[in-house]
């Protein structure tokens, strides 16, 4: 089974000339070589047109006195900024650490209270300690006195360092005073590990965590405001700490500034493109869907880590940024583009690709603004019933194994993530976990439209009593079968039995489009049906439901094949009543579609190492024109023709390359 793994600020921080897509590029901390870093920043602006550079300062306490490190680091930023005097480069700061990303290892430390985690380990310094609190104030005061163009905090401002924090004496005293309890740290850890979300002790500890993080950011902002309240700020969120992040972004923003938040959407070491990218694409889409209308400007995490071509190629770097702009994010945080690490220049390939495409991202952001999504609708959740602050069980906006990651991208089928289930669209439920997070009302609303339901989700729906609306009863049985028969195409599909087979019993009025069955050998005329496998049903709510035995947990050889893709597309055609738009290629491919003013805007990304010589699409529509967005931001005409039921475009697509096409209808 494949592992699943996509801004223009207010006037107070009008950061970048590019419309609606701002790059926050990080520059290497370069003590003694600030002139080199500044020269790099000037060249970066000249070549790419992006003017904002954040000088990276790792400011969590180290050494004794810890403030000495801060003085030296801030002085280095001052030299960097001075080297840029007279240049249009806007010198900002990335506070790469203030609490610290991971447990401490240095010897010379301040006598401040350490955080204690859920395993009883001493980890970082606790912000409740007066000494450390003053350190935070002093640090941001010194930063503000340099009047940076922007201050971005990093994702070390989080409520865990491997494990949940904080059970230090200061937090325990505060907790017990508020709750009127006398817990020891060990007793509270044990209590919380077994507690549910509505437990009063759980809620009280959760509030302390939020206050701990909020206190750090509010203290930082207060220190900045005491010096220069016009300095804009933003935050980076840690992966799956989304229950904390929005208040932090708002607290870090200057008065009148739109909050800025870098999302947790990185894809660092890209060794397994087809496995890692679908998860990343889906996360970007889900972040944008979840925070749409929140008033927060979202940045994707386009970091190259460890900041070289062993991590990420320049092509994939641009593809990552393209995905972010297409899904509607407002910009990206990038690392060390056109910078140095010590005496070694970071590959200028990253600079080259931005220079060659300096008009591309702003034009894309403008093109998708105000557009509507098309494609299968994957649920984006706003409830997190299984999220637990102590056991480290995290839930994201979309469930792992969802249809977007595991089925749509491998087959080049467009999808979207959605929070509301009232709209007339085709929904996709792939996992039991998705069904568990949906209320009965949510499910009824979905089932009054069009829905494709994969095996595990079908079983969960049957257990919830929705057989009358799906047209399928699902039971576990020991079935005898060795294949699936696709009656739409008259072919057999790979499908092996297991200890967890499901028997589908279809409503008599349902249409069975494929079956599980037994054939003694390939080509044998005998075929004994064991269960329906693809069932199409029109229910009493006016909905149409396609329920299938196919599911994301199957082995790859069963999940992905030309025959399997043809079966799914034909079944979706029957569900929707029209030809399903999709890639015309039998290979891994991101295909996302937005519609605007009679045009389709299509993002395609080739995730297969097999290059595509001519892009093609399975489409129900004829088109008047086809255009491709060029690096300079212009739309170039593409020769296209219909051939064998596909729209064939005379434009290639290399491995991990992205293309944005615009189809104008006749």
Question: Model segments located where?
Answer:
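Aromatic-lined carbohydrate-recognition surfaces of secreted/lumenal glycan-active proteins
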Residues: 20-32, 90-98, 152-156, 202-246, ...
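The substrate-binding groove and active-site-proximal loops of carbohydrate-active enzymes
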Residues: 22-33, 59-74, 118-137, 198-214, ...
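Short, acidic/polar
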Residues: 30-46, 130-143, 245-251, 313-324
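Catalytic domains of carbohydrate-active enzymes, especially glycoside hydrolases
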Residues: 35-62, 142-150, 259-260, 319-332, ...
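Aromatic-lined substrate-binding rim segments of carbohydrate-active enzymes
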Residues: 41-42, 58-110, 216, 220
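Hydrophobic targeting/anchoring helices
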Residues: 48-51, 56-57, 160-162, 196, ...
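Active-site-adjacent "subsite" loops/lids of carbohydrate-active enzymes
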Residues: 90-146, 161, 183-210
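A conserved amphipathic helix/loop scaffold
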Residues: 415, 419-420, 430-666
């Amino acid at each position: 089974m494949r592992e699943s793994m996509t801004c223009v600020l207010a006037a107070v921080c009008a950061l970048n000339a590019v419309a609606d897509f701002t790059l926050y590029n990080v520059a290497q901390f370069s003590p003694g070589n600030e002139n080199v870093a500044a020269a790099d920043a000037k060249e970066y602006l000249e070549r790419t047109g992006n003017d904002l550079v954040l000088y990276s300062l790792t400011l969590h306490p180290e050494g004794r006195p810890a403030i000495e490190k801060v003085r030296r680091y801030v002085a280095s930023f001052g030299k960097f900024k001075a080297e840029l005097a007279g240049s249009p480069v806007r010198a900002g700061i990335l506070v790469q650490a203030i609490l610290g990303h991971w447990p401490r290892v240095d010897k010379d430390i301040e006598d401040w209270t350490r955080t204690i985690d859920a395993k009883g380990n001493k980890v970082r310094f606790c912000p409740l300690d007066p000494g450390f609190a003053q350190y935070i104030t002093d640090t941001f005061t010194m930063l503000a006195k340099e009047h940076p163009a922007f201050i971005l905090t990093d994702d070390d401002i989080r409520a865990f360092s491997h494990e949940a924090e904080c059970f230090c004496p200061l937090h325990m005293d505060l907790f017990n005073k508020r709750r009127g309890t006398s817990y020891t740290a060990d007793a509270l850890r044990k209590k919380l590990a077994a507690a549910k979300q509505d437990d009063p002790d759980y809620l009280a500890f959760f509030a302390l965590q939020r206050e701990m993080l909020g206190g750090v950011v509010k203290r930082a902002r207060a220190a900045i405001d005491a010096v220069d309240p016009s300095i804009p700020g933003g935050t980076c969120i840690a992966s799956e700490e989304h229950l904390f992040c929005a208040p932090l972004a708002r607290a870090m923003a200057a008065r009148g500034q739109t909050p800025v938040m870098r999302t947790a959407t990185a894809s660092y070491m890209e060794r397994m493109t087809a496995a890692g990218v679908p998860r990343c694409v889906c996360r970007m889409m889900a972040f944008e869907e979840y925070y749409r209308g929140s008033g927060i400007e979202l940045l994707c995490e386009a970091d190259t880590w460890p900041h070289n071509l062993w991590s990420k190629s320049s092509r994939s770097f641009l593809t990552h940024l393209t995905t972010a702009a297409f899904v509607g994010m407002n910009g990206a945080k990038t690392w060390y583009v056109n910078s140095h690490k010590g005496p070694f220049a970071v590959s200028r390939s990253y600079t080259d690709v931005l220079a060659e495409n300096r008009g591309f991202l702003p034009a894309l952001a403008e093109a998708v603004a105000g557009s509507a999504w098309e494609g299968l609708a994957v649920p984006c959740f706003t409830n997190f019933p299984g999220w637990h602050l102590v056991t480290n069980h995290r839930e994201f906006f979309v469930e792992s194994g969802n249809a977007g990651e595991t089925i749509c991208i491998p087959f080049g089928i467009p999808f979207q993530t959605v929070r509301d289930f009232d709209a007339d669209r085709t929904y996709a439920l792939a996992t039991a976990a998705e069904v568990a997070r949906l209320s009965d009302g949510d499910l009824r609303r979905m089932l009054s439209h069009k829905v494709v339901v994969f095996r595990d989700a079908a079983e969960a729906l049957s257990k919830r009593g929705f057989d009358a609306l799906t047209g399928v009863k699902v039971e576990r049985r020991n079935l005898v079968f060795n294949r699936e028969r696709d009656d739409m195409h008259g072919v057999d599909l790979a499908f092996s039995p297991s200890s967890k087979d499901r028997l589908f019993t279809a409503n008599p009025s349902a249409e069975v489009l494929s079956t599980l069955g037994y054939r003694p050998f390939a080509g044998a005329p005998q075929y004994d049906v064991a269960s329906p496998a693809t069932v199409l049903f029109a229910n009493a709510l006016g909905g149409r439901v396609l329920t299938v035995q196919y599911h994301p947990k199957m082995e790859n050889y069963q999940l992905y094949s030309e025959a399997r893709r043809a079966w799914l597309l034909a079944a979706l055609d029957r569900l929707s009543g029209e030809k399903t738009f999709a890639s015309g290629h039998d290979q891994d491919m991101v295909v996302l579609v937005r519609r605007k003013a009679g045009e389709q805007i299509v993002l395609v990304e080739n995730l297969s190492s097999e290059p595509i010589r001519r892009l093609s699409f399975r489409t129900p529509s004829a088109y008047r024109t086809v255009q491709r967005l060029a690096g300079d931001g212009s739309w170039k005409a593409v020769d296209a023709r219909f051939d064998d039921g596909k729209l064939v475009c005379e434009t290639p697509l290399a491995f991990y390359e992205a293309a944005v096409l615009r189809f104008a209808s006749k």
